[in-house]
C-alpha cells in the first residue's frame, strides 16, 4: 500500500496535529437519540493542553449552568441549583454522561493517542467517499487507558479522522464514531459532526456538532481552578 513513505505513527500524528493547539474553545451541540425520544444539549468548552478542560452546559434550561472541570487527574462537577461543587470519583469517568453515549472521560479527558497507543497500518478503505488509511491502535503496557483497541480511518488527503471503532479489554466492539460535515473550523478543515453509535443498541446514538472552534486563544491556568467554576459563563 502506498502511504507516501509515512508510517502509521506519522499518519496518526498528522491527524492529531489537526487538533494540535495550546488551547481550544468550542461551541458544541450534543443530540441524544433514543428509540422513543431525542434530547439536545448545548455546551461551551475550553481546553488547555492535555491536562485542563472545562465544559459549561448552556441548555436545556434545567441543566443550564452545570459545569465540568478536568484539572490534571481531578474531575469536578458544579451544580448551580445547589451552588455546590462535587469531586467526581474516578470510576464515574467510565460511566455514561448525562444520558449520552459518551463517558465523562470522553468529554473531559484529552489524551494524546500517540503517547498511549502503539499504531499499526492495517490497510485502506473508503469512508463517506474519501480514501482513508486504516490504523489499528493497541495500548502501550504502561498506558492507563479505557480501551483495549481502537481502529481509526484517517483521510489520505487532509488527514481528517473520519471513523473510529472502540473495543473493550476483551476486544468486543463498544462504540463506533463516524465523522461528517467537513468544514473550516478555526482555520482547519475538520469533521464538524461526530455520530457515536453504541454496539448492539438499535436506534440509539449521540450526535456531536461543533458549531465554532477557536485555536490558540490565550487562557490562563487560573481559569481552570475549582474556585472559578461558579463564575464561568459562555
Model-derived regions, located:
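Short loop/turn positions at the edges of beta-strands in beta-sheet-rich folds
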Residues: 20, 47-49, 158
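Beta-strand-rich interaction surfaces with strong enrichment in secreted/lumenal proteins
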Residues: 43, 122-123, 197
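Flexible, processing/modification-adjacent segments and terminal tails
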Residues: 2-23, 29, 38-39, 67, ...
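Broad, structure-driven detector of short, well-ordered beta-strand segments within folded domains
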Residues: 44-45, 66-70, 152
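A short, sequence-level motif marking secondary-structure junctions
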Residues: 45-49, 71-72, 91-94, 180-183, ...
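Short hydrophobic/aromatic-rich beta-strand segments that constitute the beta-sheet cores
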Residues: 26, 53-57, 75-79, 85-87, ...
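N-terminal, post-signal-peptide region of Sec/Tat-exported proteins
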Residues: 25-54, 58-62
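Gly/Pro-enriched, hydrophobic low-complexity segments
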Residues: 108, 128-225
